[in-house]
Amino acid sequence: MSQGDSNPAAIPHAAEDIQGDDRWMSQHNRFVLDCKDKEPDVLFVGDSMVQLMQQYEIWRELFSPLHALNFGIGGDTTRHVLWRLKNGELENIKPKVIVVWVGTNNHENTAEEVAGGIEAIVQLINTRQPQAKIIVLGLLPRGEKPNPLRQKNAKVNQLLKVSLPKLANVQLLDIDGGFVHSDGAISCHDMFDFLHLTGGGYAKICKPLHELIMQLLEETPEEKQTTIA
């Protein structure tokens, strides 16, 4: 599904500086510097769902102790993440676990293309960081009431359930979270704008994610012993 040039969602591309302040590139450059200055065991990369996670106490509680870096940029698509990873954000580091969460902003792409873009990210990480275990977080439902974007995100997750097991070192973590109630509505207590998560919403995602990360870190006992020593 990640057919290279035939899939626009799998073609690396820097974000267009529409607003004119070059903040996207500034953030990317800061991440590249972080790669030179820090030694993360866990790397998070993606869009605002990753970026905003560090604004809540649960990041400091669960992920900061794991020497985690947060390379999330609001508005990013699979194309933008691919470009960033190809241009320095995987250099000078050797993380044990890499968490990928991106795709809900790929508005110009079909579900098949989005899934292919995510697969391309996984394949790139496998090439550049072969020691890393990769966790792909499933796309969340969005919008207060049922809508086509919810259906599209759900289809992306279904496609990834089939395709990701064929790739190395990766697993999909598709957390239900109970965000969609029995009447089909999403609560602002979970997603304050019916897209981005509240602190309580993040807790529903981050706790099972943290458990999986810890399991993967435990699978490298020799490295853990070295770290403790």
UniProtKB/Swiss-Prot annotation:
Annotated positions of the N-acetylserine modification: S2
Pfam families registered for this protein in UniProt: Lipase_GDSL_2
Alphabetical list of InterPro entries matching this protein: SGNH_hydro (IPR013830), SGNH_hydro_sf (IPR036514)
Assigned keywords, A-Z: Acetylation, Cytoplasm, Hydrolase, Lipid degradation, Lipid metabolism, Phosphoprotein
EC number: 3.1.1.47
Domain of life: Eukaryota
Residues annotated as the enzyme's active site: S48, D193, H196
Single annotated GO MF: protein homodimerization activity
Regulation of this protein's activity per its record: Beta subunit (PAFAH1B1) stimulates the acetylhydrolase activity of the alpha2/alpha2 catalytic homodimer.
Residues in the signal sequence: none
Modified-residue entries (Phosphothreonine), positions: T220
Compartments, record wording: Cytoplasm
Modified residues (Phosphoserine): S2, S64
Coiled-coil annotated spans: none
Tissues in which the protein is found: Expressed in heart, brain, spleen, lung, liver, kidney and testis. Not expressed in skeletal muscle. Expressed in fetal as heterodimer and adult brain as homodimer. In neural cells, expressed in granule cells, astroglial cells, and oligodendrocytes.
Catalytic activity: a 1-O-alkyl-2-acetyl-sn-glycero-3-phosphocholine + H2O = a 1-O-alkyl-sn-glycero-3-phosphocholine + acetate + H(+); 1-O-hexadecyl-2-acetyl-sn-glycero-3-phosphocholine + H2O = 1-O-hexadecyl-sn-glycero-3-phosphocholine + acetate + H(+); 1-O-hexadecyl-2-acetyl-sn-glycero-3-phosphate + H2O = 1-O-hexadecyl-sn-glycero-3-phosphate + acetate + H(+); 1-O-hexadecyl-2-acetyl-sn-glycero-3-phosphoethanolamine + H2O = 1-O-hexadecyl-sn-glycero-3-phosphoethanolamine + acetate + H(+)
PANTHER family: PLATELET-ACTIVATING FACTOR ACETYLHYDROLASE, PLATELET-ACTIVATING FACTOR ACETYLHYDROLASE IB SUBUNIT ALPHA2
Family designation: Belongs to the 'GDSL' lipolytic enzyme family. Platelet-activating factor acetylhydrolase IB beta/gamma subunits subfamily.
Other observations noted: Originally the subunits of the type I platelet-activating factor (PAF) acetylhydrolase was named alpha (PAFAH1B1), beta (PAFAH1B2) and gamma (PAFAH1B3). Now these subunits have been renamed beta (PAFAH1B1), alpha2 (PAFAH1B2) and alpha1 (PAFAH1B3) respectively.
Subunit field text: Forms a catalytic dimer which is either homodimer (alpha2/alpha2 homodimer) or heterodimer with PAFAH1B3 (alpha2/alpha1 heterodimer). Component of the cytosolic (PAF-AH (I)) heterotetrameric enzyme, which is composed of PAFAH1B1 (beta), PAFAH1B2 (alpha2) and PAFAH1B3 (alpha1) subunits. The catalytic activity of the enzyme resides in the alpha1 (PAFAH1B3) and alpha2 (PAFAH1B2) subunits, whereas the beta subunit (PAFAH1B1) has regulatory activity. Trimer formation is not essential for the catalytic activity.
Function: Alpha2 catalytic subunit of the cytosolic type I platelet-activating factor (PAF) acetylhydrolase (PAF-AH (I)) heterotetrameric enzyme that catalyzes the hydrolyze of the acetyl group at the sn-2 position of PAF and its analogs and modulates the action of PAF. The activity and substrate specificity of PAF-AH (I) are affected by its subunit composition. The alpha2/alpha2 homodimer (PAFAH1B2/PAFAH1B2 homodimer) hydrolyzes PAF and 1-O-alkyl-2-acetyl-sn-glycero-3-phosphorylethanolamine (AAGPE) more efficiently than 1-O-alkyl-2-acetyl-sn-glycero-3-phosphoric acid (AAGPA).
Name listed for the protein in its UniProt record: Platelet-activating factor acetylhydrolase IB subunit alpha2
Organism in which the protein naturally occurs: Rattus norvegicus (Rat)
Gene name of this polypeptide: Pafah1b2
